[in-house]
Amino acid sequence: MKVISSIHELRDQLRGQNRTAFVPTMGNLHEGHLSLMRLARQHGDPVVASIFVNRLQFGPNEDFDKYPRTLQDDIEKLQKENVYVLFAPTERDMYPEPQEYRVLPPDDLGGILEGEFRPGFFTGVCTVVTKLMACVQPRVAVFGKKDYQQLMIVRRMCQQLALPVDIIAAETVRDEDGLALSSRNRYLSADERSEAPELAKTLQRIRESVLGGEHDLGKLEEMARTHLAGRGWAPDYISIRRRANLIAPDAAQLEAGEPLVVVAAAKLGATRLIDNLEI
C-alpha cells in the first residue's frame, strides 16, 4: 500500500485507473470502516482510502483538536485490507490557502436534524468530499448508513453536480450489544459505555411500534426523548422521517406504507452519539 499526502502524487499514481473505489474517512479506523473497504472492493478496483480530519466540518466548540488521530495504527489495518493507496494529506495539502469557495447543501436537507444542531457541518462535509472526489476521481465511493443524513446529502450533491461517481451505501456495523461503532465511542467512560446501547434499543422499540401500527409519531418521539432523558441522556433529536427526503411523513404516507427511518442524536455525558434505524 502506498501512503500519499500530495494531491499531485496521488493523481500521478491513479492515472489511467477507471474503476477506482474510494472510501473517505477521518481515521481512527474500526471494524465499521474496514467493512467499507471490503464493500468497496466488491464494486471497484483499486480501492483508495483517505484519512483527513477536516477542520471545516467542526464547529468552534466541537472536538477537532481532541479527535483521535491514529495514523500508524490505521495504516496497518488498511494494509491488511489490501488497500492500494491511502491518501493522507496534511491540512496544508488540502487547504494550501484559505478555502473561500464552499459547497452549500440546500436548507431542506442540510439545515435540518444534524444541520440544525451543527451549523456549517454539512457545508464542511460537502466541500471536502467534493475536493477529495476531484483528487481521487473514483468510479464509486462508499459511505456508511450510520451517518444517514450525510449519505443522502452526498448522494444528492453528486447527482446535482453531475459528478461521475456512484455512491454505495454500507450497512451500520454494531457491537454485540447493539451500539453502532464510532470513533467517538472511545470518549465514553466505562459506565457510559454500559449505558450507550440504550440509544439503539430505543430506536428498535420505535421501529417495532410503527410496524405494529402506531401512527402517532409525535407521541413515540416524545416518549423516546423522555425515556432517554430519564436515564441521563441529553437528546438533541429523535425523529421519524421519510427515507426519500428526511421530511416527516403525513398520515396518507403512513397509511400507504411509506419507507421510514428513525434518526437520533443524543449526548451521554460529554459524548454525542448518533444512530438511526430504517423502518
Swiss-Prot record:
Localization in the cell: Cytoplasm
Binding site for ATP: 26-33, 144-147, 173, 181-184
Pathway(s) served: Cofactor biosynthesis; (R)-pantothenate biosynthesis; (R)-pantothenate from (R)-pantoate and beta-alanine: step 1/1
Binding residues for beta-alanine: Q57
Binding-site residues, (R)-pantoate: Q57, Q150
Gene3D superfamilies hit by this protein: HUPs, Pantoate-beta-alanine ligase, C-terminal domain
GO CC field: cytosol
Active-site residues (renumbered): H33 (proton donor)
Annotated catalysed reactions: (R)-pantoate + beta-alanine + ATP = (R)-pantothenate + AMP + diphosphate + H(+)
Pfam families: Pantoate_ligase
Entry's EC annotation: 6.3.2.1
PANTHER family registered for this protein in UniProt: CYTIDYLATE KINASE/PANTOATE-BETA-ALANINE LIGASE, PANTOATE--BETA-ALANINE LIGASE
Family: Belongs to the pantothenate synthetase family.
Matching HAMAP family: PanC
UniProt name for this protein: Pantothenate synthetase
Lineage: Bacteria, Pseudomonadati, Pseudomonadota, Betaproteobacteria, Burkholderiales
